[in-house]
Amino acid sequence: MQQKQDIKGFTILELLVVITIVAVVSAVGYPNFMDWRLDREMRASMEKVSSMLRSINTQAQRGNFSIVQFMVKPSSNSTEFISKGMSKSAESTIANTSGQTVTCRIVTSGYWTNQQVEYSNNDVATNIDANGAVCFSKDTRYFLKEGKLSSLLNVSIEGRLTSNYIIICTTENATKSGGKCATNQLDGLEKPAYLVEWNRFGNISKFKWGGSGWSRL
């Protein structure tokens, strides 16, 4: 004779306990997940900027362009990053024309041989609230800055001051600082934030904001 199996389901109380536990775990874990996601987004944008700077400098070193430009074009909710190049013949024409000098001109047409070598649009903010650009050349003869990148405040990195950088932070953080990323803790810079530094030789360095200072990556 087959015995009856004593099979019981969950009681309403047990289900409520399980639901409560899941809710508590979710409430604790969700903020951490959001922080992680934001950090990944900021870091990805920083890596893109770093890659674009290295790439355009490599093209200058190879002689593809005589002068190259990295341009930052911020808007209210995103930032465009654009690299451009000027051919040797175009640079020579400007340099040899009376009354003209080679500059890091910010334009949307003309002047540059290639107006868009590389382009990226990211939902991030930077430490500038209007267009800015930096230009490099193979022989370091040209190391020029234009627009907002020509008048940056010095920031302290590894015990030294530099004005050759771009900071990437969330648009929410930038809103608290007048529409652009702050440059230090006192002015309101918050995590996650990243910084890309360059020099006239085209060397690129990357840093992460730790809450009170910059750490090299």
Map each language-model feature to its residues.
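N-terminal helix-rich module
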Residues: 28-35, 39, 47, 58, ...
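G2-box/ATP-lid motif of Bergerat-fold
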Residues: 65-68
